[in-house]
Amino acid sequence: MKNELMQRLRLKYPPPDGYCRWGRIQDVSATLLNAWLPGVFMGELCCIKPGEELAEVVGINGSKALLSPFTSTIGLHCGQQVTALRRRHQVPVGEALLGRVIDGFGRPLDGRELPDVCWKDYDAMPPPAMVRQPITQPLMTGIRAIDSVATCGEGQRVGIFSAPGVGKSTLLAMLCNAPDADSNVLVLIGERGREVREFIDFTLSEETRKRCVIVVATSDRPALERVRALFVATTIAEFFRDNGKRVVLLADSLTRYARAAREIALAAGETAVSGEYPPGVFSALPRLLERTGMGEKGSITAFYTVLVEVDDMNEPLADEVRSLLDGHIVLSRRLAERGHYPAIDVLATLSRVFPVVTSHEHRQLAAILRRRLALYQEVELLIRIGEYQRGVDTDTDKAIDTYPDICTFLRQSKDEVCGPELLIEKLHQILTE
C-alpha cells in the first residue's frame, strides 16, 4: 500500500529539474528492457549502469518504462541501475559529414572523429504546407528511362518498387550521380555487411563519395538502430536543405525500416493489424516522409526503395507508401532476366509532377514512347509465334519497327550520364524519323 502511494505521488509531482531520476531493470527480453523508472517521457534517453550503455524509452505503463537499448541485450540482467538523462537523442549535422560513413545513431564508422558539427533532434516536425515552395524545376537524374517519361521534380518524393536481385543497388548508385544535386545522403538499412562495403568501395565513384554522407545500419544491428538510421539520414538532409542546398536523399530500404519498427512495436505489446504491421508503423510513415521535399530555400528530393514479393505492388506496405509519395519507379524482374538494365518498367512508372517540370515537346515525345511500348506489348506474343500480320494497323507497325531502338535508348551503363539536351535529341531521332 505504501509503495503504491509513493508511486502515485511521484507521478503527480515529478522531480524538479536537475534531480537525478533512476530505477532498476525488472525484465530483459531479446529486444526490450522493462524497468521501474517513474517520471520518464517517450523518447527519453537512459543510461544503464555500470556499463554506461544507452537505451531509449519506447513505452510507458504507469511507473514502468519499456526501453529499447542501443546495443544487444546480451549481458544485461535484472537489477541493473537505469538513470534517465532528461534529453532525447541528437544527431550530428554539418558540412564535415560529407565523404564520411556513420552508423544509425550518427557515430563515425571510419575511425575518425567528427569535428565542426552541430547537433539536432532526430525527430523534427515537417515544414508547414504553406511554407514549402512549390515544385517547379526538374531534377535530372541522368538516367534516360527516368528522365524521358517520368522526369522528377526538385523536391519530389519517389518510391522505387523492386523485388530482390533486379538491380536496385546499381540504380541507387546511378542516382547518386544526379548532375543537378549539390549533395547526397545515402542510408543503407538492414543490408549485409559485405554488400555495404562492396557498394561503397566499388559501386560508388570516388567523386560521388566526396559529396555524399553515408548512414549504415546493417542487418545484425539492433532494431532501434535500423529504425533510427532513416531518421538520422533525414535530419542530415534537412540541415543541407535549410542551408539552401539541393539534396538527394536515397533510402534503401523503407521495407527494412518498417520491419525493424514492427519488431519494436510488437515487443512493446502493439497488435498487428494490416499485413502483420502494427498501426504505429503506418502512423509514423507520413510524418517521416513529409519531412523531405521543398523547404523555404533548398530542397530534398527523396528516393525510397520498397521491396515487393513476386512483383506484388498491392501488398499493404507498398500500397501505403505509394499513396504517400509523389511518384514511383517500378523495376521488372522480366526485364532483368533479359539483361535489360536499368530494369525499369516504363509503363508502370509514374511521376506526378511530370506535367509541371517538362516542356510541351517533351510530354508529346514521352506520350509517343509510352504508346509504342504499350502497342508492342499487346502484340508481342503474336510476333513470337509468327501470327502477326503487318499492314493491319499502321501505329502497331511503327511500334514494332522502333521497338529495338527504344530498348537500346532505355538501356544504360552504370557510369553513363545523359544530359537533357541529348535526351530530347535522341527521342526525336527514334520517334519522329
Predicted regions and their residues:
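Glycine/charge-rich, flexible interdomain linkers and switch-proximal surface loops
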Residues: 20, 96-97, 147, 233
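P-loop NTPase catalytic core
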Residues: 148-150, 155-433
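Phosphate-interacting basic helix/loop segments used at nucleotide- and nucleic-acid interfaces
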Residues: 6-9, 85, 141-146, 233, ...
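Acidic-enriched and Gly/Ser
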Residues: 2-18, 24-141
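P-loop NTPase nucleotide-binding/switch module
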Residues: 80-82, 96, 109-156, 169-174, ...
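Short, charged, intrinsically disordered terminal tails
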Residues: 1-13, 422, 426-433
